Amino acid sequence: MTTSLAAIAPHGGQLINRLAPEAERQEFLAIADKLPRVQLDERATSDLVMIAIGGFSPLKGFMEQDDYELVVEEMKLSNGLPWSVPVTLSVTEEVAAPLEVGSWVRLDNSAGKFIGVLELTQKYHYNKAHEAKNVYRTDDQAHPGVKVIYDQGPVNLAGPIWLLEREPHPLFPKYQIDPAASRQLFAERGWKTIVGFQTRNPIHRAHEYIQKCALEVVDGLFLHPLVGATKSDDIPADVRMRCYEIMVDNYFPKERVILGINPSAMRYAGPREAIFHALIRKNYGCTHFIVGRDHAGVGDYYGTYDAQEIFDEFAPEALGIVPMKFEHAFYCKKTLQMATTKTSPSGPEDRIHLSGTKVRALLRDGQLPPPEFSRPEVAQELIRAMQGES
């Protein structure tokens, strides 16, 4: 049994593909040495890839000024579609000055390898403080997302892009499932409702609980850990992926779960990033998206449920993906199971609250997270990694 892929429409109705056809690729390679170059950092490189594979549909390139300003101020594109986070290529004045609008620009990765081209349609200055305050709700440069804005150049380069080649991920090639492939997988399994789960943390019992709650009411679960750029104190992606492999192998029904990597970078934009993450999963073919406590947050910049409440600012049909909102789950010592205030009669003294932050703190102190926090196999994997034994 299969379901129509058209029933799970990408954002804007069409899955964008900006992988250069072979003929164009050869043309770009032939003129590569004659093109002006822009070197991309890790985040811009992952943005380039996400645009090319359709993860950022309907974007075909880095945002022009009208889209950028509407996204920053009103969380929508110039065509009216919801979009909450700017996707821009910011460079210094020195890099921007010689570039001519209407020309091709060679895009190199941080190692200097030619990976894509930009058809330059605009160069424009932008207000860093305005972007920070609107997107991140703060201009505090201690915020990692705000710091990126202030560290990057003052000029945005805009225009459609082409990615020369979709290379296998160096660490997780078997889990590199791009949007066209995930949609096909969902259809082959006959899934009509699919819930996506975003994380940058190792899986703990609270995650497992809300994932399984969601799985009770949909056909399939798409575990989609982010493996792009994150904060330096986040658990490394290879460790997180091993933890997810352990969980899928031992604690989930394999026929109802697909594990794949999300190559995009974290912005730590809290509520706005929750919308962004939901739209990405819509492009991958998900019909539902899990939004938990302080989704995509950092520090104390956002309220516990701000990332859930922001969904109420959009018409459901405009987003086209259903948020599944979960309260902060905890281990209940009274009922001896995972619960939330909706299902547990216990008082605060009988609740063990879990978080990736707490797990990281235990690991840094050389302590094995207790079974209320983490499955034992996952805890062992984490402690091995922290001790440098992996």
UniProtKB/Swiss-Prot annotation:
Pathway: Sulfur metabolism; hydrogen sulfide biosynthesis; sulfite from sulfate: step 1/3. Pfam families: ATP-sulfurylase, PUA_2. GO terms for biological process: hydrogen sulfide biosynthetic process; sulfate assimilation. GO terms for molecular function: ATP binding; sulfate adenylyltransferase (ATP) activity. Its EC number is 2.7.7.4. InterPro entries: ATP-Sase_PUA-like_dom, PUA-like_sf, Rossmann-like_a/b/a_fold, SO4_adenylyltransferase_pro, Sulfurylase_cat_dom, Sulphate_adenylyltransferase. The keyword Ion transport does not apply. The keyword Transcription does not apply. It comes from the Bacteria. It is an enzyme of class 2 (transferase). Keywords: ATP-binding, Nucleotide-binding, Nucleotidyltransferase, Transferase. NCBIfam families: PRK04149.1, sopT. Belongs to the sulfate adenylyltransferase family. This is Sulfate adenylyltransferase.
